[in-house]
A protein has these predicted regions:
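Core segments of small alpha/beta cavity-forming domains
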Residues: 31-90, 94
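Short, low-complexity Ser/Thr-rich regulatory SLiMs
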Residues: 5, 106, 141-143
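Short beta-strand edge/turn micro-motifs at domain boundaries
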Residues: 113, 134-156
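Juxtamembrane and targeting peptides
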Residues: 1-48, 52
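Solvent-exposed, non-transmembrane alpha-helical starts
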Residues: 125-131, 151
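Short solvent-exposed loop/turn micro-motifs enriched in small/polar/acidic residues
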Residues: 97-98, 132-134
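Short linear capping/connector segments at secondary-structure termini
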Residues: 26, 60-64, 101
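Surface-exposed, charged secondary-structure patches
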Residues: 91-124
């Protein structure tokens, strides 16, 4: 009986370690620093572009989003930005966004899950004092033909 319990214990330990080892090994965010840096850079640049605009040049931001977003992210963004396009000129709204921190939570060859923190500064009209805010986003990205695209965005 003791031998059987010991054997079961050893087997469970080996299985648990092999499962966690293979899960960690398949997450390139833990094992491939250059790939992690690449997706971090690409997604940071994307978010800086699509969440920054001036009331008189919203088309520049919309064009960037059309190029850099895919799938659900693009659909959601288009709905949100329709409101911006309508309201920003009347308020003379300018928004500057900058990614302040990024955590790549999961990374495979062509897919990534990231947690991103944005610092945002909005100026309305002739106000000299910007309003500042922070945002957290869960981002899903996909590599297509060697380029990273945001495919889903969700506030956290």
């Amino acid at each position: 009986m003791t031998v059987l319990l010991t054997a079961v214990g050893v087997w469970c330990t080996v299985e648990a370690r092999s499962t966690s080892a293979s899960a960690a090994a398949s997450n390139h965010a833990l094992t491939d620093q250059p790939a992690t840096a690449e997706v971090t850079s690409a997604i940071s640049l994307t978010l800086n572009k699509i969440f920054s605009y001036t009331y008189d040049k919203t088309g520049v931001t919309e064009n960037a989003a059309a190029t850099l977003l895919r799938g659900h992210a693009r659909e959601s963004y288009e709905k949100l930005f329709a409101q911006v396009r309508t309201m920003a000129p009347g308020q003379r709204l300018t928004l500057a966004s900058r990614v302040s921190a990024t955590s790549v939570q999961q990374l495979t060859e062509n897919n990534a899950q990231l947690l991103v923190f944005l610092d945002q500064s909005a100026t309305r009209g002739n106000s000299a004092t910007p309003e500042t805010a922070a945002a957290q986003l869960s981002v899903t990205a996909q590599r297509i033909d060697g380029n990273w695209y945001v495919t889903d965005l969700a506030p956290r």
